[in-house]
């Protein structure tokens, strides 16, 4: 059963400035006003033209669609993708026939500098770290076995949520933690493991009736099911205080290993079951199947589980489209969350989106959390409160939306004053269908299924246009921190 406890009051950071159009556009408007006043002393016509052009440009840039993008954002997005496509950067080839000497199937794009490192935790157990060469970060993936809330009482379910909030708060106070991501991967079960397990339990001299019953069970229930896996990935970034450089793998593994016992305990308290750290083979196999879905049946059919090296876990070929991503035997589309639900939700809101969908051969939902440290939390809460109040004061008749923002900002400031932390969160959804004849129809059907499930969860999804390859990589449970791949912007520094 689902608890009746509701959750909400999330809000976007308020841009500030005049009418909350943002500080850069506000400064631009003041600049237009100053130039207009100076020109009016010399040439009134030139001043009028300057004011009209300047105010018109600012108005166009201030208008944003439901995806929070203006004309400039959409134009840059499209032109950047076209320029990269003309340069051939939307195509990738690897393996023996690729124009490289290694002959390996390495990962493409922003995953090209990702490697795996083995180390020991506080108890001497071996674990695997994902090293991000581009950003100097390290990620630690845990395989979880969530107990679920289907048979849990309301108080138990509420305790899970409270423990999850405690985990986020503890990570916010931990130096070096930059991101937490939870990935739920659902795929059709081939039935190979089911048949193998039943075959192992069948003896040669079994009674005829029992043998026939087992054979009938294997035929009826081997296919048609779905398998789900849940991976929690923590991303760390450590810098040497003396040299200013990122820590080497041994030093980073030593610091991360000390946190493992406490993390496993907190994950269990939050309903994640007994978490265990993934091995190199499991991570490589997981990535290989994501890029080549047809390989899943082959890997499960082989009795000895062939070893997959990390250097060969990537695709043989992939091609990035404007709204899709073709990789080996699959075609995928990835969405990002534009807005959270407008109203309060319960703990079962994402149930349909996280569960198997009939029109998707594979589906991966990744929820990403960025926890602000306590010192920045108090500053941002107060900043949002002041900007929300300024927005109401600038309106002659305050709208319901503006008043709601004020109420949310006030409650947020009160909670942060009591010790709560601000958490930025996002959501990525990747749907994969098998490549081949009729793939466009199957991809459209998967699109309708995903968007319908997101609609029932009251989440506004948007395809990651022009960045399908990067979004696909970010949805994998490798701890990729997209914030560190975004080029610095002067406008972001001014906002």
Regions found by a protein language model. Give the residues of each.
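Extended, folded cores of ATP/NTP-driven motor/assembly subunits in large transport
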Residues: 2-7, 11-24, 46-495
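Hydrophobic, membrane-inserted alpha-helices
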Residues: 28-38, 54-58
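Membrane-interfacial hairpin junctions
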Residues: 35-49
């Amino acid at each position: 059963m689902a608890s009746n406890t509701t959750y909400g009051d999330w809000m976007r950071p308020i841009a500030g400035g005049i009418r909350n159009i943002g500080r850069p556009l506000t400064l631009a408007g003041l600049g237009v006003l100053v130039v207009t006043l100076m020109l009016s002393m010399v040439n009134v016509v030139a001043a009028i033209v300057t004011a009209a052009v300047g105010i018109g440009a600012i108005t166009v840039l201030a208008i944003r669609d439901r995806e929070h993008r203006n004309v400039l954002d959409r134009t840059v997005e499209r032109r950047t993708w076209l320029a990269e496509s003309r340069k051939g950067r939307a195509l990738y080839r690897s393996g023996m026939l690729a124009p490289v000497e290694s002959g390996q199937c390495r990962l493409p794009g922003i995953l090209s500098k990702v490697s795996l490192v083995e180390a020991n935790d506080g108890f001497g157990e071996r674990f695997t770290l994902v090293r991000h060469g581009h950003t100097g970060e390290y990620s630690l993936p845990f395989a979880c076995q969530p107990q679920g809330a289907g048979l849990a009482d309301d108080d138990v379910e509420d305790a899970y949520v409270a423990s999850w909030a405690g985990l986020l708060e503890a990570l916010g106070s931990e130096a070096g933690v930059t991101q937490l991501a939870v990935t739920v991967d659902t795929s059709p079960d081939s039935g190979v493991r089911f048949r193998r397990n039943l075959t192992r339990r069948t003896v040669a001299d079994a009674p005829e009736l029992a043998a026939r019953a087992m054979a009938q069970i294997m035929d009826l229930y081997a296919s048609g099911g779905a398998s789900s896996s849940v991976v929690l990935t923590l991303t760390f970034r450590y810098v040497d205080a003396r040299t200013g450089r990122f820590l080497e793998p041994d030093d980073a593994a030593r610091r991360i290993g000390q946190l493992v016992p406490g993390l496993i305990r907190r994950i269990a308290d939050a309903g994640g079951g007994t978490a265990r750290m993934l091995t190199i083979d499991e991570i490589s196999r997981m990535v290989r199947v994501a890029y080549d879905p047809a390989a899943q049946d082959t890997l499960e059919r082989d009795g000895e589980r062939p070893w997959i090296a990390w250097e060969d876990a990537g695709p043989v070929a992939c091609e990035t489209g404007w709204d899709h991503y073709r990789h080996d035997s699959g075609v995928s589309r990835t969405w990002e969350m534009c807005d959270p639900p407008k109203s309060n939700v319960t703990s079962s809101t994402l149930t349909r989106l996280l569960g198997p969908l009939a029109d998707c051969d594979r589906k991966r939902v990744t929820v990403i959390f960025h926890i602000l440290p306590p010192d920045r939390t108090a500053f941002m809460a107060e900043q949002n409160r002041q900007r929300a109040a300024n927005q109401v004061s600038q309106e002659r008749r305050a709208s319901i939306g503006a008043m709601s923002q004020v109420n949310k900002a006030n409650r947020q400031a009160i909670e942060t004053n009591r010790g709560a932390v601000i958490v930025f969160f996002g959501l990525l959804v990747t749907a994969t269908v098998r490549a081949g004849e009729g793939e466009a129809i199957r991809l459209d059907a998967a699109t309708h299924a995903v968007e319908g499930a997101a609609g029932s969860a009251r989440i506004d999804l948007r395809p990651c246009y022009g960045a399908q390859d990067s979004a696909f990589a970010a949805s994998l449970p490798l701890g990729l921190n997209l914030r560190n791949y975004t080029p610095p912007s002067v406008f972001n520094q001014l906002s």
